[in-house]
């Protein structure tokens, strides 16, 4: 089926459109401009042990995320695989038990039909579940939404995300004493991740 798909829809770079070998891959030039695996120390992020960033939010990567979130192009989410593959090769992660996606509001999910974070990361986690003993756990609830935060100042973001998340009651016990990996699509100030980490630590994670 893969060869038929490639025949009918020849694989192209998601940004510049030039031919590539496989669906979901980038041309070297476009990938080099946005691939940027780096680590931020924990002292910059209250409640977190650290933060891995996979790419620069610009150019082709910015367009890709925007299309998945706002232009109903969910199939484009597969184009993050080169970033996750490169991250895998670096063997960066400490031992973890559970991987939790940052949720979107119920209103946005009803409009969009999915949480883009699931599309970017869930398959990657499930493919490695046996090897790493990971479990994908959709344990967080986003209680409300007051619009997108990309235009807000750091102080406005902090006020916005305070008490923004809650934990699904059926998962409270499962979180106790566990090492967690939070995944999200965009990192700006870290306020969203810090807010999620705060409530998870209160639950004993």
Where are these regions (language model features)?
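Glycine-rich phosphate/pyrophosphate-handling loop used in enzymes and phosphotransfer proteins
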Residues: 1-205
